Structures are given as structure tokens and as C-alpha cells.
């Protein structure tokens, strides 16, 4: 599972709104689209260890780089709304038709928004570690994490990261550090420097705070039960911002939701909880 380079499929590209978007895929069958997060260096490569196993399970497993991430073109003006809207446009350009979404981190909010807006396009939704889809933190929980995260975000936008910075970032988000190979670090660092770093800096200045653009009258976590397609949610108990406790609260509040909370798992759910994702995700998608 650590020999990432040997698992890497060929880079492919499609054109969306005049931008060249890079994607990787494996297998054939019903489409499953993996959506990466928003931190510096995020790209389709974070799913390299997941595509092959899902392909072997009978799916066309696909992951793409959002505009401004990885090897995709960088738009003149970036926004979270543009990233979200690139998802259905990529689906059309890549010929995925009706597809399941496996969304990590901030992309979970995108997936839920899109599935609520046009349920006919999406067969299933799997959410991995999306904190914005949990009940908010209590006053007692808010504090140290936010201060540390704000400092890290500022530092990441000030100086181009080193290879060691890339390793530390992965270690901070992964419970089992033995999963992090030199190849993982090299791939992450590649997507953190050069034009990607400049794009990250630009996003800090251009992005609106809400993933959907306008403020929402009802938080997305309160709308999860409105989804028309099957929904599976997986969180790491040791994830940031008390995610484990908040996931327990959501599970107790809405026992009808399929929520799995994995011990020994931080934010990189698809790495730390690889076996859990396969064990729960494959039969869920086959249902």
C-alpha cells in the first residue's frame, strides 16, 4: 500500500471552461468519483492507494485535480464556488454519467450541496472527515486548535514549503505514520510548490468563507437527512477539532444516518481507515 509510484495510473486531461483538468482512473463499471480536500498540496494523488482496490471491486474509480490544484490549470480568479461547480462539469467531460461521490474534507460539503441540488446525477455519497458536516464545536471545545490552525495557514501562505514541511503536514493529518512513504511525501511536495504555491496564496486572498458562496439559512449538517440517495459518513476518532465527539453527537441525534467512527484515525480517513472504507464502502456502493 505504500509503494505509491507503482500504483500510479497515467495522467489524463479533459477541458472544462477552457481549463485543462488532470485526472487519474482505474477499472471499469459504475463510476465512483473521489474528491480531494483543499489544503496546500491536495490533489487526486491522495487517492492513489484507493483507486486500484475500488477498481478490483468492480468500479470505474476516478479522481481529478480541482482547478488550481495538482496538475490542473490555474484559473485567473479562484473561488470555492468555482471548485464546487467544476465537479459536475468534470463528470460530463469525462463521460462518467451518473456517479457515486467519495468526498474528503472540504469536498464533503460540495458533495452534499450538489446531491441536494440535483439528486438525479449522483447514485451514492460517501463523506470522509468533513468537519463542516458535523454539529459545531461547543464553547469549551473551541480554542487551541483554531489558534494553531490559523497560524499554520498563515505560515503555509508565506513561504514555499520544503520536503520536510510536506512530511510534517501529512504526519499531522495521519494517525499511523508508517503509512507515509517517501513517495507520498514527494508527490505531496510536488503539488505544494511553484504555480501550486502561488495559486494557494491567491486563494487565501480571493476565496469567500462559505463553500457555497452565499450564507446558508440552514447548516448542511442539518440537511443530511434530506438527501435522496444513500449516504455513508466515516470519521476518524482522533481527527482535528473534536471531530470524533461531534460525530458521536450527530450519530446520536440522527440514528437513521450511516455513520462510522474509526479508532486510530485522523483526518486522512482514506489512509488510516483504508480497511474500513473498503469493508463498508464497497457493499454500500453495490447496494
Question: Whereabouts are the PLM-identified features?
Answer:
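Conserved HGGG/HGGXW glycine-rich cap/lid loop of the alpha/beta-hydrolase fold
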Residues: 15-71
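Short alpha-helix in the alpha/beta-hydrolase fold that links the catalytic acid
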Residues: 47, 184, 220, 229, ...
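Active-site loop/oxyanion-hole signature of alpha/beta-hydrolase fold enzymes
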Residues: 56, 63-102, 106, 136, ...
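Flexible "cap/lid" loop of the alpha/beta hydrolase fold
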Residues: 112, 116, 123-162, 168
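Conserved alpha/beta-hydrolase catalytic His-Asp/Glu region
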Residues: 142, 159-225
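Short beta-strand/loop motif that positions the catalytic acidic residue
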Residues: 227, 233-235
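Acidic catalytic loop of the alpha/beta-hydrolase fold
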Residues: 237-242
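Catalytic active-site module of serine/aspartate enzymes centered on a nucleophile-bearing elbow/loop
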Residues: 255-287
